[in-house]
Amino acid sequence: GLIDVKCYASRECWEPCRKVTGSGQAKCQNNQCRCY
């Protein structure tokens, strides 16, 4: 799901998502990180 992290590129979301979900799968969507 979406987390409260602003981004411009999907790679900016990899670390935050790994901390939240334990998975590095992430996308930057509408300048916000989405974890899968």
Swiss-Prot record:
Pfam families: Toxin_2. Belongs to the short scorpion toxin superfamily. Potassium channel inhibitor family. Alpha-KTx 16 subfamily. This is Potassium channel toxin alpha-KTx 16.8. It comes from the Eukaryota. One of its GO terms (cellular component) is extracellular region. Gene3D superfamilies: Knottin, scorpion toxin-like. Disulfide bonds join 7-28, 13-33, 17-35. Has the structural arrangement of an alpha-helix connected to a beta-sheet by disulfide bonds (CSalpha/beta). Poorly competes with (125)I-kaliotoxin binding on rat brain synaptosome (IC(50)>100 nM). Is a poor Kv1.3 ligand. May have as real target KCa1.1/KCNMA1 channel. Shows weak toxicity on mice. The record marks 36 as: Aromatic residue of the functional dyad. Expressed by the venom gland. The record marks 27 as: Basic residue of the functional dyad. It is found in: Secreted. InterPro entries: Scorpion_toxin-like_sf (IPR036574), Scorpion_toxinS_K_inh (IPR001947).
